[in-house]
């Protein structure tokens, strides 16, 4: 009977060790849980960025206002009949 109790105690100790520290144990669970939370945050940021890009693509396909705005800001274009004024600030000596 004594050997049986020792064997059960050893078995219980081994099972506890594998539960807490073994492969797919509690420590691995918390590590994976933290990695999932980080990845979900990254995914939500990327999804928001994708939505903004899709909205910009739709705007470029549908309307000329977005194309005109990009041409003005990125290429410095001016409409015919408009006068462009650039105000330059004073440099500090």
UniProtKB/Swiss-Prot annotation:
Note whether Methyltransferase occurs among the keywords: no
Q: Which residues lie on this side of the membrane: Cytoplasmic?
A: 1-3
* TM regions (residue ranges): 4-21
- Identify the stretch annotated as signal peptide in this record: none
Name any Gene Ontology BP term: FtsZ-dependent cytokinesis
Q: Name one GO cellular component term.
A: cell division site
List each coiled-coil range: 32-75
Cellular compartment(s): Cell inner membrane
For membrane topology, the record states: Single-pass type II membrane protein
Its keywords, alphabetically, are: Cell cycle, Cell division, Cell inner membrane, Cell membrane, Coiled coil, Membrane, Transmembrane, Transmembrane helix
The record's similarity note reads: Belongs to the FtsB family.
| NCBIfam families, A to Z | PRK00888.1
Q: How does it assemble?
A: Part of a complex composed of FtsB, FtsL and FtsQ.
Q: What is this protein called?
A: Cell division protein FtsB
This chain is encoded by the gene named ftsB
């Amino acid at each position: 009977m004594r050997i049986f109790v020792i064997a059960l105690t050893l078995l219980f100790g081994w099972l506890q060790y594998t539960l807490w520290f073994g492969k797919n144990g509690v420590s691995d669970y918390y590590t994976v849980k933290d990695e999932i939370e980080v990845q979900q945050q990254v995914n939500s940021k990327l999804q928001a960025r994708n939505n903004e890009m899709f909205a910009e693509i739709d705007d470029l396909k549908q309307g000329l206002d977005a194309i005109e705005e990009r041409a003005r800001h990125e290429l410095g274009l001016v409409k015919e009949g408009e006068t462009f004024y650039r105000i330059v600030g004073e440099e500090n000596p």
